[in-house]
């Protein structure tokens, strides 16, 4: 789905394997591509089957399309927990990392910033770009929950982790973003901003150990702020598992991206 400047929806296209190889090891991709039965890749969180390769290619390709066109990729499976060599935390392919590498390799984009507001830290994305000063990774997440990474100060010079206490809501969430993420992105001056848009910090989510109280307005405001940080912005869906609220939250984020784009322009 495209951002409001291009208010039409379309089906994504599967990624080429070469795009995935910019992020993931050939051995892991071979394993995923040749599964013939349900197999635990990350017990007890991530199982894959003979159809998972097709789904993973489509998710990654849709993320690439979104990055190219300034869109919002509504995909499953999500991706931000997947490191280069394996699956993890429901994630098979790191969609946002694949999109970032594609834009650098195929479209000459230099600096890419990735802002991740999923309630869980995106350990996979952090790992992919740990030694790459052309990509800034900034994560706003609840402290002390899965996957146990993302401590304050963890990572290199182009990593910004903002762990938040359980129970915080819109005001603390937005303040942390304003204080820590916005200045880091502004200093980095990205040509492209990719958003790992997870909605599982919402007050109506019911996930083990998650205790956040972000509202629809909180997601709208964070999306608005993200859209004002770079000349080109795209988003990829990460977490968010309450099917009764997810469409509403995506709509709120799209509203925010639209108003942020207008402000930036």
Regions found by a protein language model. Give the residues of each.
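HDAC/HDAC-like amidohydrolase catalytic core signature
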Residues: 1-115, 120-265
């Amino acid at each position: 789905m495209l951002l409001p400047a291009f208010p039409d929806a379309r089906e994504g296209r599967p990624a080429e394997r070469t795009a995935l190889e910019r992020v993931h090891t050939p051995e892991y991709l071979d394993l995923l591509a040749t599964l013939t039965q349900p197999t635990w890749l990350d017990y007890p969180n991530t199982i894959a089957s003979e159809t998972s390769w097709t789904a993973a290619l489509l998710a990654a390709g849709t993320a690439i399309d979104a990055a190219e066109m300034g869109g919002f990729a509504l995909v499953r499976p999500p991706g931000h927990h997947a490191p280069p060599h394996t699956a993890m935390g429901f994630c098979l392919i790191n969609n946002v990392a694949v999109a970032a590498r594609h834009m650098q390799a195929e479209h000459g984009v230099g600096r890419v910033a990735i802002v991740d507001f999923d309630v869980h830290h995106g350990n996979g994305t952090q790992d992919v770009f740990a030694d790459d000063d052309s990509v800034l990774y900034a994560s706003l997440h609840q402290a002390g929950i899965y996957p146990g990474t993302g401590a304050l100060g963890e990572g290199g010079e182009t990593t910004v982790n903002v762990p938040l206490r359980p129970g915080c809501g819109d005001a603390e969430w937005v303040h942390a973003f304003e204080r820590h993420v916005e200045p880091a992105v502004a200093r980095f001056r990205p040509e492209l901003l990719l958003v790992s848009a997870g909605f599982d910090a919402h007050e109506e989510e019911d996930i083990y150990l998650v205790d956040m109280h972000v509202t629809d307005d909180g997601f709208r405001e964070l999306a608005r702020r993200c859209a004002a940080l770079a000349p080109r912005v795209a988003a990829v869906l990460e977490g968010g598992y309450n099917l009764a609220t997810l469409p509403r939250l995506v709509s709120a984020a799209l509203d925010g991206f639209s108003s942020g784009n207008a402000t930036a322009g």
